[in-house]
Amino acid sequence: MTKSNTINRIGTPLSATATKVMLLGSGELGKEVIISLQRLGVEVIAVDRYSNAPGHQVAHRSYVIDMTDEVALAELINQEKPDLIVPEIEAIATAKLVELENAGTIRVIPTARAAWLTMDREGIRRLAAEELGCATSPYRFADNLKELQAGCAEIGFPCIVKPVMSSSGKGQSKLSSSADVAAAWDCAAAGGRVDSGRVIVEGFIDFEYEITLLTVRAIGADGEVHTHFCEPIGHVQVNGDYVESWQPQRMHPGALQKAHEIAKRVTDNLGGLGLFGVELFVKDDMVWFSEVSPRPHDTGMVTMASQEQSEFELHAKAILGLPVNVALSTPAASAVIYGRHDGKVVSFEGVAEALHIPGTDIRLFGKPESFARRRMGVALAKAADVDTARKNAKAAAAKVNPVVSS
Protein backbone atom coordinates (compact mmCIF):
# COMPACT_ATOMS: atom_id res chain seq x y z
CA MET A 1 0.00 0.00 0.00
CA THR A 2 1.28 3.47 -0.93
CA LYS A 3 -0.05 7.01 -0.83
CA SER A 4 -2.11 6.30 -3.94
CA ASN A 5 -4.30 4.01 -1.80
CA THR A 6 -4.86 6.53 0.97
CA ILE A 7 -6.95 9.65 1.46
CA ASN A 8 -5.18 12.55 -0.25
CA ARG A 9 -7.09 15.40 1.37
CA ILE A 10 -9.47 15.85 4.29
CA GLY A 11 -12.71 17.68 3.59
CA THR A 12 -15.13 19.60 5.76
CA PRO A 13 -17.75 17.68 7.75
CA LEU A 14 -21.39 17.96 6.64
CA SER A 15 -20.40 19.39 3.27
CA ALA A 16 -19.89 18.08 -0.25
CA THR A 17 -16.16 17.70 0.45
CA ALA A 18 -16.59 15.66 3.65
CA THR A 19 -14.25 12.78 4.38
CA LYS A 20 -16.65 10.19 5.80
CA VAL A 21 -15.73 7.36 8.14
CA MET A 22 -18.24 4.76 9.34
CA LEU A 23 -17.54 2.93 12.61
CA LEU A 24 -19.11 -0.49 13.00
CA GLY A 25 -19.31 -0.74 16.78
CA SER A 26 -19.58 2.36 18.95
CA GLY A 27 -18.55 1.40 22.48
CA GLU A 28 -16.00 3.17 24.66
CA LEU A 29 -13.11 2.46 22.30
CA GLY A 30 -15.07 3.56 19.27
CA LYS A 31 -16.09 6.74 21.09
CA GLU A 32 -12.45 7.75 21.53
CA VAL A 33 -11.65 6.93 17.90
CA ILE A 34 -14.56 9.14 16.83
CA ILE A 35 -13.31 12.03 18.96
CA SER A 36 -9.83 11.67 17.44
CA LEU A 37 -11.25 11.60 13.91
CA GLN A 38 -13.42 14.65 14.54
CA ARG A 39 -10.39 16.61 15.72
CA LEU A 40 -8.96 15.96 12.26
CA GLY A 41 -12.08 17.27 10.52
CA VAL A 42 -13.63 13.93 9.61
CA GLU A 43 -17.38 13.33 9.35
CA VAL A 44 -18.19 10.24 11.41
CA ILE A 45 -21.11 7.82 11.26
CA ALA A 46 -21.46 5.56 14.32
CA VAL A 47 -23.24 2.22 14.11
CA ASP A 48 -24.11 -0.18 16.92
CA ARG A 49 -26.68 -2.79 17.90
CA TYR A 50 -28.24 -0.64 20.66
CA SER A 51 -29.28 3.00 20.87
CA ASN A 52 -27.35 5.75 22.64
CA ALA A 53 -24.11 3.76 22.62
CA PRO A 54 -21.05 5.76 23.77
CA GLY A 55 -19.92 6.49 20.21
CA HIS A 56 -23.43 7.53 19.16
CA GLN A 57 -23.18 10.42 21.62
CA VAL A 58 -20.27 12.09 19.82
CA ALA A 59 -20.80 11.17 16.14
CA HIS A 60 -22.33 13.31 13.41
CA ARG A 61 -24.93 10.60 12.76
CA SER A 62 -25.77 7.30 14.36
CA TYR A 63 -27.65 4.15 13.43
CA VAL A 64 -28.89 1.07 15.26
CA ILE A 65 -28.79 -2.13 13.20
CA ASP A 66 -27.91 -5.79 13.54
CA MET A 67 -24.40 -5.64 12.10
CA THR A 68 -24.39 -9.40 11.50
CA ASP A 69 -27.29 -8.92 9.05
CA GLU A 70 -25.65 -8.76 5.61
CA VAL A 71 -28.61 -7.05 3.94
CA ALA A 72 -29.03 -4.35 6.60
CA LEU A 73 -25.28 -3.68 6.66
CA ALA A 74 -24.99 -3.42 2.87
CA GLU A 75 -28.02 -1.10 2.68
CA LEU A 76 -26.56 1.28 5.27
CA ILE A 77 -23.17 1.33 3.56
CA ASN A 78 -24.85 2.11 0.24
CA GLN A 79 -26.91 4.86 1.87
CA GLU A 80 -23.96 6.61 3.54
CA LYS A 81 -21.18 5.77 1.04
CA PRO A 82 -18.31 6.26 3.53
CA ASP A 83 -14.72 6.70 2.40
CA LEU A 84 -13.57 4.29 5.11
CA ILE A 85 -15.29 1.59 7.14
CA VAL A 86 -13.73 0.96 10.55
CA PRO A 87 -14.84 -2.21 12.36
CA GLU A 88 -14.63 -1.75 16.13
CA ILE A 89 -16.08 -5.10 17.22
CA GLU A 90 -15.99 -8.70 15.98
CA ALA A 91 -19.73 -9.38 15.57
CA ILE A 92 -20.10 -8.02 12.03
CA ALA A 93 -21.07 -9.60 8.71
CA THR A 94 -17.42 -9.65 7.66
CA ALA A 95 -18.04 -11.92 4.67
CA LYS A 96 -20.18 -9.14 3.18
CA LEU A 97 -17.38 -6.62 3.83
CA VAL A 98 -14.95 -8.91 1.97
CA GLU A 99 -17.40 -9.18 -0.93
CA LEU A 100 -17.92 -5.41 -1.15
CA GLU A 101 -14.22 -4.61 -0.83
CA ASN A 102 -13.33 -7.15 -3.52
CA ALA A 103 -15.90 -5.47 -5.76
CA GLY A 104 -14.12 -2.16 -5.21
CA THR A 105 -17.10 -0.43 -3.63
CA ILE A 106 -15.69 0.07 -0.10
CA ARG A 107 -12.40 0.29 1.79
CA VAL A 108 -12.27 -1.47 5.16
CA ILE A 109 -9.72 -0.73 7.92
CA PRO A 110 -7.25 -2.32 7.97
CA THR A 111 -8.63 -4.67 5.29
CA ALA A 112 -11.83 -6.68 4.96
CA ARG A 113 -9.74 -9.86 5.07
CA ALA A 114 -8.21 -8.80 8.39
CA ALA A 115 -11.66 -8.09 9.82
CA TRP A 116 -12.84 -11.50 8.62
CA LEU A 117 -9.82 -13.41 9.96
CA THR A 118 -9.95 -11.76 13.37
CA MET A 119 -13.72 -11.92 13.84
CA ASP A 120 -13.22 -15.20 15.69
CA ARG A 121 -10.41 -16.99 17.45
CA GLU A 122 -10.20 -19.80 14.93
CA GLY A 123 -9.27 -17.73 11.90
CA ILE A 124 -6.49 -15.81 13.56
CA ARG A 125 -5.14 -18.78 15.53
CA ARG A 126 -4.84 -20.92 12.42
CA LEU A 127 -3.16 -18.05 10.57
CA ALA A 128 -0.64 -17.33 13.34
CA ALA A 129 0.21 -20.91 14.29
CA GLU A 130 -0.30 -22.91 11.11
CA GLU A 131 0.61 -20.42 8.37
CA LEU A 132 3.01 -18.00 10.05
CA GLY A 133 4.69 -20.42 12.48
CA CYS A 134 4.17 -18.33 15.61
CA ALA A 135 4.48 -20.10 18.95
CA THR A 136 1.07 -20.48 20.62
CA SER A 137 -0.55 -22.60 23.28
CA PRO A 138 -1.71 -26.04 22.05
CA TYR A 139 -5.34 -25.88 20.90
CA ARG A 140 -8.31 -27.77 19.53
CA PHE A 141 -11.73 -26.68 18.24
CA ALA A 142 -15.07 -28.27 19.07
CA ASP A 143 -18.64 -27.98 17.77
CA ASN A 144 -20.41 -29.99 20.45
CA LEU A 145 -19.98 -31.36 23.94
CA LYS A 146 -18.59 -34.69 22.75
CA GLU A 147 -15.91 -32.97 20.65
CA LEU A 148 -15.12 -30.67 23.56
CA GLN A 149 -14.63 -33.64 25.88
CA ALA A 150 -12.27 -35.22 23.36
CA GLY A 151 -10.39 -31.96 22.82
CA CYS A 152 -9.89 -31.39 26.53
CA ALA A 153 -8.63 -34.96 26.92
CA GLU A 154 -6.07 -34.38 24.14
CA ILE A 155 -4.93 -31.01 25.47
CA GLY A 156 -4.92 -32.10 29.11
CA PHE A 157 -5.80 -30.22 32.28
CA PRO A 158 -5.73 -27.45 33.29
CA CYS A 159 -7.03 -25.89 30.09
CA ILE A 160 -9.09 -22.90 28.95
CA VAL A 161 -12.33 -23.05 26.97
CA LYS A 162 -13.62 -19.98 25.09
CA PRO A 163 -16.28 -19.31 22.46
CA VAL A 164 -14.63 -18.72 19.09
CA MET A 165 -16.38 -15.34 19.11
CA SER A 166 -16.74 -13.36 22.34
CA SER A 167 -15.26 -10.33 24.04
CA SER A 168 -14.22 -9.18 27.52
CA GLY A 169 -13.85 -12.74 28.78
CA LYS A 170 -17.51 -13.63 28.22
CA GLY A 171 -18.08 -17.38 28.06
CA GLN A 172 -14.54 -18.25 29.17
CA SER A 173 -13.77 -21.01 31.69
CA LYS A 174 -10.68 -22.52 33.26
CA LEU A 175 -11.04 -26.30 33.59
CA SER A 176 -9.22 -28.33 36.23
CA SER A 177 -10.62 -31.76 35.35
CA SER A 178 -13.04 -33.61 33.08
CA ALA A 179 -15.79 -32.87 35.60
CA ASP A 180 -15.71 -29.21 34.48
CA VAL A 181 -16.28 -29.82 30.76
CA ALA A 182 -20.09 -29.79 30.61
CA ALA A 183 -20.33 -26.57 32.62
CA ALA A 184 -17.67 -24.98 30.39
CA TRP A 185 -19.70 -25.86 27.29
CA ASP A 186 -22.81 -24.23 28.77
CA CYS A 187 -20.81 -21.16 29.82
CA ALA A 188 -19.36 -20.76 26.32
CA ALA A 189 -22.78 -21.13 24.72
CA ALA A 190 -24.17 -18.39 26.95
CA GLY A 191 -21.22 -16.02 26.49
CA GLY A 192 -20.61 -16.15 22.74
CA ARG A 193 -21.27 -13.07 20.60
CA VAL A 194 -23.19 -15.07 18.01
CA ASP A 195 -24.83 -18.47 18.12
CA SER A 196 -22.01 -20.35 16.37
CA GLY A 197 -21.78 -23.12 18.96
CA ARG A 198 -18.04 -23.48 18.33
CA VAL A 199 -15.34 -23.24 20.98
CA ILE A 200 -11.57 -23.31 21.28
CA VAL A 201 -9.74 -25.39 23.89
CA GLU A 202 -6.34 -23.97 24.82
CA GLY A 203 -3.61 -25.65 26.78
CA PHE A 204 -2.40 -23.77 29.84
CA ILE A 205 0.89 -21.88 29.38
CA ASP A 206 3.13 -21.32 32.38
CA PHE A 207 3.75 -17.66 31.53
CA GLU A 208 5.21 -14.98 33.76
CA TYR A 209 3.13 -12.07 32.46
CA GLU A 210 1.06 -11.03 29.45
CA ILE A 211 1.35 -7.92 27.34
CA THR A 212 -0.41 -5.99 24.64
CA LEU A 213 1.98 -4.74 21.99
CA LEU A 214 0.25 -1.91 20.15
CA THR A 215 1.56 -2.14 16.60
CA VAL A 216 0.89 0.62 14.07
CA ARG A 217 1.09 0.36 10.28
CA ALA A 218 1.33 3.88 8.89
CA ILE A 219 2.53 5.69 5.77
CA GLY A 220 6.00 7.20 6.11
CA ALA A 221 7.50 10.24 4.40
CA ASP A 222 8.70 7.93 1.61
CA GLY A 223 5.14 6.92 0.81
CA GLU A 224 5.62 3.36 2.01
CA VAL A 225 4.06 1.50 4.94
CA HIS A 226 6.21 1.41 8.08
CA THR A 227 5.59 -0.57 11.28
CA HIS A 228 5.84 1.21 14.63
CA PHE A 229 5.73 -0.36 18.10
CA CYS A 230 4.47 1.33 21.25
CA GLU A 231 6.15 0.45 24.52
CA PRO A 232 4.73 -2.86 25.80
CA ILE A 233 1.63 -2.67 27.98
CA GLY A 234 1.34 -4.99 30.96
CA HIS A 235 -2.10 -5.96 32.13
CA VAL A 236 -4.12 -8.07 34.51
CA GLN A 237 -7.14 -10.01 33.32
CA VAL A 238 -9.70 -11.79 35.47
CA ASN A 239 -11.62 -14.51 33.62
CA GLY A 240 -10.39 -12.99 30.37
CA ASP A 241 -11.64 -9.50 31.20
CA TYR A 242 -9.23 -6.56 31.43
CA VAL A 243 -9.02 -5.15 34.96
CA GLU A 244 -5.93 -2.92 34.91
CA SER A 245 -3.06 -2.06 32.58
CA TRP A 246 0.20 -0.14 32.76
CA GLN A 247 2.91 1.14 30.47
CA PRO A 248 5.76 0.43 30.11
CA GLN A 249 6.03 -3.24 31.04
CA ARG A 250 9.65 -4.21 31.64
CA MET A 251 10.82 -7.00 29.34
CA HIS A 252 13.99 -8.97 28.72
CA PRO A 253 15.59 -7.46 25.56
CA GLY A 254 15.43 -10.82 23.82
CA ALA A 255 11.75 -11.20 24.63
CA LEU A 256 10.99 -7.69 23.37
CA GLN A 257 12.74 -8.45 20.09
CA LYS A 258 10.73 -11.66 19.69
CA ALA A 259 7.53 -9.78 20.51
CA HIS A 260 8.32 -7.25 17.77
CA GLU A 261 9.05 -10.04 15.30
CA ILE A 262 5.79 -11.88 16.02
CA ALA A 263 3.71 -8.70 15.90
CA LYS A 264 5.24 -7.62 12.60
CA ARG A 265 4.82 -11.07 11.07
CA VAL A 266 1.12 -11.14 11.95
CA THR A 267 0.29 -7.53 11.08
CA ASP A 268 2.23 -7.66 7.80
CA ASN A 269 0.07 -10.59 6.79
CA LEU A 270 -3.15 -8.82 7.78
CA GLY A 271 -2.03 -5.72 5.88
CA GLY A 272 -3.64 -2.31 5.55
CA LEU A 273 -3.20 0.71 7.77
CA GLY A 274 -4.04 1.34 11.41
CA LEU A 275 -3.33 0.15 14.91
CA PHE A 276 -3.36 -3.49 16.01
CA GLY A 277 -3.51 -4.79 19.57
CA VAL A 278 -1.27 -7.88 19.64
CA GLU A 279 -1.66 -9.95 22.82
CA LEU A 280 1.32 -12.06 23.88
CA PHE A 281 2.34 -14.32 26.77
CA VAL A 282 5.90 -13.93 28.08
CA LYS A 283 8.26 -15.90 30.29
CA ASP A 284 11.95 -14.95 30.46
CA ASP A 285 12.86 -14.59 26.77
CA MET A 286 10.07 -16.87 25.50
CA VAL A 287 7.05 -15.31 23.78
CA TRP A 288 3.77 -16.92 22.70
CA PHE A 289 1.15 -15.37 20.44
CA SER A 290 -2.34 -15.19 21.96
CA GLU A 291 -4.66 -12.95 19.93
CA VAL A 292 -4.73 -9.82 17.77
CA SER A 293 -7.36 -7.14 17.31
CA PRO A 294 -7.08 -4.94 14.18
CA ARG A 295 -8.20 -1.91 16.16
CA PRO A 296 -7.52 -0.12 19.48
CA HIS A 297 -7.40 -2.46 22.45
CA ASP A 298 -9.10 -2.10 25.83
CA THR A 299 -5.79 -2.47 27.70
CA GLY A 300 -4.46 0.36 25.54
CA MET A 301 -6.69 2.93 27.25
CA VAL A 302 -3.65 3.62 29.43
CA THR A 303 -2.12 5.42 26.43
CA MET A 304 -4.53 8.31 27.02
CA ALA A 305 -2.18 9.14 29.90
CA SER A 306 1.14 7.56 28.92
CA GLN A 307 1.87 8.47 25.31
CA GLU A 308 2.36 11.55 23.18
CA GLN A 309 -0.47 10.20 21.01
CA SER A 310 -3.04 7.79 22.44
CA GLU A 311 -3.87 4.55 20.65
CA PHE A 312 -7.01 6.26 19.37
CA GLU A 313 -5.09 9.17 17.86
CA LEU A 314 -2.61 6.72 16.35
CA HIS A 315 -5.40 4.70 14.75
CA ALA A 316 -7.16 7.80 13.40
CA LYS A 317 -3.98 9.27 11.92
CA ALA A 318 -2.72 6.00 10.48
CA ILE A 319 -5.96 5.17 8.65
CA LEU A 320 -6.00 8.66 7.13
CA GLY A 321 -2.43 8.22 5.88
CA LEU A 322 -0.98 10.74 8.35
CA PRO A 323 2.32 10.49 10.29
CA VAL A 324 2.24 8.92 13.76
CA ASN A 325 4.27 9.31 16.95
CA VAL A 326 4.40 6.30 19.30
CA ALA A 327 6.68 7.92 21.89
CA LEU A 328 6.05 7.29 25.58
CA SER A 329 5.73 10.49 27.62
CA THR A 330 5.41 9.10 31.16
CA PRO A 331 4.81 5.88 33.07
CA ALA A 332 1.07 5.48 33.60
CA ALA A 333 -1.65 3.01 34.51
CA SER A 334 -5.36 2.43 34.04
CA ALA A 335 -7.94 0.69 36.23
CA VAL A 336 -11.48 -0.21 35.23
CA ILE A 337 -14.51 1.35 36.91
CA TYR A 338 -17.12 -1.40 37.04
CA GLY A 339 -20.86 -1.29 37.33
CA ARG A 340 -22.08 -2.65 40.66
CA HIS A 341 -25.84 -2.84 40.16
CA ASP A 342 -28.32 -3.41 37.32
CA GLY A 343 -30.23 -0.39 36.07
CA LYS A 344 -30.87 2.01 33.19
CA VAL A 345 -30.65 5.42 34.89
CA VAL A 346 -26.98 5.72 35.75
CA SER A 347 -25.02 8.42 37.59
CA PHE A 348 -21.61 8.48 39.26
CA GLU A 349 -20.55 9.38 42.78
CA GLY A 350 -17.03 9.97 44.03
CA VAL A 351 -15.54 11.51 40.90
CA ALA A 352 -14.17 14.56 42.72
CA GLU A 353 -12.66 12.38 45.43
CA ALA A 354 -10.99 10.23 42.78
CA LEU A 355 -9.46 13.24 41.07
CA HIS A 356 -7.88 14.45 44.32
CA ILE A 357 -5.43 11.55 43.99
CA PRO A 358 -2.24 12.93 42.39
CA GLY A 359 -1.79 12.50 38.65
CA THR A 360 -5.20 10.98 38.00
CA ASP A 361 -7.91 11.47 35.42
CA ILE A 362 -11.27 9.79 34.82
CA ARG A 363 -13.10 8.71 31.67
CA LEU A 364 -16.80 7.88 32.05
CA PHE A 365 -18.06 6.00 29.01
CA GLY A 366 -21.70 7.14 29.02
CA LYS A 367 -23.20 3.68 28.68
CA PRO A 368 -26.98 3.93 29.01
CA GLU A 369 -27.31 0.82 31.17
CA SER A 370 -25.32 -0.58 34.08
CA PHE A 371 -24.97 -4.11 35.36
CA ALA A 372 -22.57 -5.87 37.66
CA ARG A 373 -19.03 -6.06 36.22
CA ARG A 374 -19.88 -3.97 33.17
CA ARG A 375 -17.10 -1.53 32.26
CA MET A 376 -18.57 1.91 32.94
CA GLY A 377 -15.38 3.97 32.99
CA VAL A 378 -11.66 3.95 33.56
CA ALA A 379 -9.30 5.70 35.95
CA LEU A 380 -5.95 6.88 34.59
CA ALA A 381 -2.86 7.82 36.56
CA LYS A 382 0.54 9.26 35.66
CA ALA A 383 3.52 8.90 37.99
CA ALA A 384 7.30 8.76 38.09
CA ASP A 385 7.12 4.95 38.09
CA VAL A 386 4.66 2.25 37.10
CA ASP A 387 4.10 0.93 40.63
CA THR A 388 2.92 4.33 41.89
CA ALA A 389 0.77 4.83 38.81
CA ARG A 390 -0.91 1.44 39.33
CA LYS A 391 -1.58 2.18 42.99
CA ASN A 392 -3.11 5.58 42.22
CA ALA A 393 -5.21 4.34 39.29
CA LYS A 394 -6.71 1.54 41.38
CA ALA A 395 -7.38 3.91 44.27
CA ALA A 396 -9.13 6.39 41.96
CA ALA A 397 -11.24 3.68 40.33
CA ALA A 398 -12.34 2.42 43.74
CA LYS A 399 -13.70 5.85 44.71
CA VAL A 400 -16.03 6.13 41.70
CA ASN A 401 -19.39 4.49 42.33
CA PRO A 402 -21.89 4.02 39.48
CA VAL A 403 -25.37 4.26 41.00
CA VAL A 404 -28.67 3.40 39.35
CA SER A 405 -32.14 4.85 39.86
CA SER A 406 -34.19 2.16 38.16
Swiss-Prot record:
GO terms for molecular function: ATP binding; magnesium ion binding; phosphoribosylglycinamide formyltransferase 2 activity; phosphoribosylglycinamide formyltransferase activity. Its EC number is 6.3.1.21. It catalyses: N(1)-(5-phospho-beta-D-ribosyl)glycinamide + formate + ATP = N(2)-formyl-N(1)-(5-phospho-beta-D-ribosyl)glycinamide + ADP + phosphate + H(+). It comes from Janthinobacterium sp. (strain Marseille) (Minibacterium massiliensis). GO terms for biological process: 'de novo' IMP biosynthetic process. It comes from the Bacteria. ATP binds at R121, K162, S167, S168, G169, K170, G171, Q172, E202, G203, F204, I205, E210. GO terms for cellular component: cytosol. Involved in the de novo purine biosynthesis. Catalyzes the transfer of formate to 5-phospho-ribosyl-glycinamide (GAR), producing 5-phospho-ribosyl-N-formylglycinamide (FGAR). Formate is provided by PurU via hydrolysis of 10-formyl-tetrahydrofolate. Belongs to the PurK/PurT family. Residues 126-320 form the ATP-grasp domain. N(1)-(5-phospho-beta-D-ribosyl)glycinamide binds at E28, L29, E88, D298, K367, R374, R375. HAMAP family: PurT (MF_01643). This is Formate-dependent phosphoribosylglycinamide formyltransferase. SUPFAM superfamilies: Glutathione synthetase ATP-binding domain-like, PreATP-grasp domain, Rudiment single hybrid motif. Keywords: ATP-binding, Ligase, Magnesium, Metal-binding, Nucleotide-binding, Purine biosynthesis. Homodimer. Pathway: Purine metabolism; IMP biosynthesis via de novo pathway; N(2)-formyl-N(1)-(5-phospho-D-ribosyl)glycinamide from N(1)-(5-phospho-D-ribosyl)glycinamide (formate route): step 1/1. InterPro entries: ATP-grasp (IPR011761), ATP-grasp_carboxylate-amine (IPR003135), ATP_grasp_subdomain_1 (IPR013815), PreATP-grasp_dom_sf (IPR016185), PurT (IPR005862), PurT/PurK_preATP-grasp (IPR054350), PurT_C (IPR048740), Rudment_hybrid_motif (IPR011054). Mg(2+) binds at E279, E291.
